[in-house]
């Protein structure tokens, strides 16, 4: 005869307390800067976490698409065992339209959520936390 494990009610803290490890990444608030040929869009990256690999529990930084491209290239070079997902594609027409900017914002958020949520990258990447949390991140420092 097999023993039936005792069941118990979860405590209030178990139900409503913070999860053991959590990571929330949001890409929001796109802003277009410059004029004419020098225009570009930047995006706010908001991170909330209690994962030790990230120095700050809450951070907000701003990055442009080209920063994401450099970041992805650096990740690929430093993390040969992990397949880094693609970024949303380059856009050459109407790239400052609301629809295009929103589509890109969604793609950048999906990219960061996948990358930041990967356990090997959380523990092994030197650039990950810096890109997501350091307002003075410099693509040329890597």
Swiss-Prot record:
Protein localization: Cytoplasm; Golgi apparatus membrane; Prevacuolar compartment membrane
Membrane topology annotation: Peripheral membrane protein
GO MF assignments: phosphatidylinositol-3-phosphate binding
Chief localisation class: cytoplasm
This protein's record includes keyword Secreted: no
Organism domain of life: Eukaryota
Signal peptide (residue range): none
Domain PX: 21-138
Record: residues binding a 1,2-diacyl-sn-glycero-3-phospho-(1D-myo-inositol-3-phosphate): 64, 66, 90, 95, 104
BP term (GO), one: endocytic recycling
Keywords (A to Z) from UniProt: Cytoplasm, Golgi apparatus, Lipid-binding, Membrane, Protein transport, Transport
Family annotation (SMART domains): PX
GO cellular component, one term: retromer complex
Record comment regarding domains: The PX domain binds phosphatidylinositol 3-phosphate which is necessary for peripheral membrane localization.
Family: Belongs to the sorting nexin family.
Role played: Required for retention of late Golgi membrane proteins. Component of the retrieval machinery that functions by direct interaction with the cytosolic tails of certain TGN membrane proteins during the sorting/budding process at the prevacuolar compartment. Binds phosphatidylinositol 3-phosphate (PtdIns(P3)).
Stated name of the protein: Sorting nexin-3
Annotated source species: Aspergillus oryzae (strain ATCC 42149 / RIB 40) (Yellow koji mold)
